[in-house]
């Protein structure tokens, strides 16, 4: 793993926001999952719950609650991945003494248990003293992804849509790019990400994410325009021509996701099971490039 910015296990980031690290570092979780306790009073909102059975995390969460003489009133989940929902049972058993409290989450087609969550939609709000959260649908990383707008600070909890460092993975690139633009348009003062350090240069970070994805998209479009029809594997071989075979195999899924997005944009057809054809027009990536060239 490349060198990562140090993230404190427990850190008070503002009057209303305390970050508790999930104690689960790894290639995909970076320093670990960031969970957050929100509020200035005795009632707190917990954003995400870390992985299951991580004793160090539960101990850290207990210590913050004890030191602030507070308790968890609500839990809000950004998305279904195990490093964000996995700690729910441990928290329920070891901190809430099996008391059931609202756990808010967006519903997805393949969900983990209907009775566990209170399913809510885009625009839902939950509040405690000093912290009013508006839930904003930002699909792409996953279909059920919420980002959370903290009204008092004009700050955003981005879940895994944007990370404190590095880039994230996604299920649907078309939806993901739309969500990135939605986040940019919010003009947040800062971003509290699901992994990594706090982001204060918000527009710069979001633009970096958008350009990273559009650069690869433009490379794929160039290859498509050079062929009548072409398979996703052949696109991958040309775009990643200088990469080892193992890297190309790993990149194939990302290429397929870009092709899926271009089909949604209406500039590519999928006439046969594994072949794709450029039919013309401008993709979102090309439009953005043209805007930049006119500045």
From Swiss-Prot:
Pfam families: BLACT_WH, Lactamase_B. GO terms for molecular function: metal ion binding; RNA endonuclease activity; single-stranded RNA binding. GO terms for cellular component: mitochondrial matrix. Zn(2+) 2 binds at residues 83-84, 160, 195. The keyword Zinc applies. Its EC number is 3.-.-.-. Keywords: Hydrolase, Metal-binding, Zinc. Zn(2+) 1 binds at residues 79, 81, 141, 160. Belongs to the metallo-beta-lactamase superfamily. Glyoxalase II family. This is Beta-lactamase-like protein 2 homolog. It comes from Caenorhabditis elegans.
